[in-house]
């Protein structure tokens, strides 16, 4: 069940923006609004808190930034500089990752073509592929044998509890069969298992999937197969952002804002770490990988807008709008606008219409 908190609890976020007020205003004096601001400090804080929490509870842990969330060169390069690997979902994203100097790359998408796989194999020294299906396994296996190129791979799995997310990967019950099929291809080194679901407001997805996967491995894998499991990727989907929520509209009345009350990244890490110790440690010796996206880049970018016109005390026109984000996120979710020329710690009602 989703929990909500009061909008007053956004004050900590507002205070952080106000502390950076002079930097924003200096930029606005030099560059016409609207524009985007890359916040290196904000990104560093997110990376450091994420990595510290998970390494505290999972010593053999690696983090990979999900490039699809924001592929701006400054974001991607900084993730690499801070020691993260990169998770890519297309050849375009792979090229961005290579240009950023990434040495650790995971390539996963459910619709890889033969040409995609050939291109990835050229960079097999830096990239591991997470396979989505038996058909893809056979396609990649034949390509590696033909080209005589070795590459490390994993397979994405799902359980019935994953709902619509069962469109990705293979059923958990097919995992041993997949492992046996992969052994037919000498240039494929299958050593990883991958699962993911977005927007997990609680830890139950991770805890339950780890439990189910561990039980399956114990009951179905041979001792040699268990020894070959060197990596488990539990994806991302951490619902952490303190400013997110929903807009509740009732007729012509002012909308109500319900701010999501989410658990902390430390709580995610602790629960996942405890599940790994309980379920995986007795049967496999693996490295654990996660692919955070929004957690890393959410506070790394801001949009600076100006008021173009004031219609009345309740309505004004801005010189930019939701098109600057790329989708209608602000129509369904709540994010605070902070007045940096006349800052206040009190929230006020005003309709801010986009250009």
Task: List each language-model region with its residue ranges.
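A charged N-terminal "starter" segment
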Residues: 1-151, 184-185, 189, 222-225
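Active-site loop/helix belt of alpha/beta enzymes
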Residues: 2, 159-306
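Active-site beta-loop-alpha junctions enriched in small/polar residues
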Residues: 41-42, 66-72, 91-92, 110-112, ...
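Charged (often Lys/Glu-rich) extended helix/loop segments that serve as interaction or gating elements
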Residues: 48, 271-277, 281-355
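Short, solvent-exposed amphipathic alpha-helical segments in soluble enzyme
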Residues: 80-81, 144-147, 170, 304-306, ...
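Structured core elements
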Residues: 85, 106, 128-130, 154-156, ...
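Short helix/loop capping segments that flank catalytic or ligand/cofactor-binding pockets
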Residues: 97, 139, 242, 298, ...
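A generic local secondary-structure boundary/capping motif
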Residues: 141-145, 167, 340-341
């Amino acid at each position: 069940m989703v929990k909500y908190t009061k909008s007053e609890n956004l004050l900590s976020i507002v205070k952080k923006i106000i502390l950076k007020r002079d930097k924003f205003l200096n930029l606005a004096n030099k560059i016409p609004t609207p524009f985007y601001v890359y916040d290196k400090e904000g990104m560093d804080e997110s990376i450091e808190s994420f990595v510290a929490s998970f390494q505290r509870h999972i010593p053999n842990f690696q983090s990979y930034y999900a490039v699809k969330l924001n592929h701006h060169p400054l974001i991607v390069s900084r993730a690499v500089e801070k020691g993260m690997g990169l998770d890519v979902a297309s050849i375009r994203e792979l090229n961005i990752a290579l240009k950023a100097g990434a040495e650790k790359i995971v390539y996963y998408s459910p619709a890889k073509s033969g040409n995609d796989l050939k291109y990835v194999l050229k960079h097999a020294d830096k990239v591991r592929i997470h396979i989505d299906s038996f058909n893809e396994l056979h396609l990649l296996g034949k390509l590696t044998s033909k080209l005589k190129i070795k590459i490390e791979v994993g397979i994405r799995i799902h359980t019935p509890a994953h709902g619509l997310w069962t469109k990705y990967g293979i059923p958990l019950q097919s995992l041993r069969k997949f492992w046996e099929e992969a052994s037919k291809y000498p240039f494929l080194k299958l050593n990883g298992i991958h699962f993911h679901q977005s927007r997990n407001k609680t830890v139950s997805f991770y805890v339950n999937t780890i439990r189910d996967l561990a039980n399956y491995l114990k009951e179905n894998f041979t001792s040699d197969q268990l020894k070959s499991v060197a990596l488990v990727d539990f994806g991302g989907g951490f619902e952490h952002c303190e400013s997110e929520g929903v807009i509740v509209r009732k007729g012509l009345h002012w909308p109500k804002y319900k701010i999501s009350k989410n658990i902390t990244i430390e709580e995610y890490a602790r629960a996942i770490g405890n599940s790994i110790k309980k379920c995986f440690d007795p049967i496999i010796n693996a490295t654990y990988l996660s692919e955070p996206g929004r957690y890393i880049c959410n506070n790394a970018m801001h949009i600076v807008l100006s008021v173009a016109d004031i219609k009345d005390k309740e309505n004004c026109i801005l010189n930019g709008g939701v098109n600057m984000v790329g989708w209608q996120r602000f129509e369904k979710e709540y994010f605070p606008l902070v007045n940096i020329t006349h800052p206040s710690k009190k929230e006020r009602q005003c309709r801010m219409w986009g250009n």
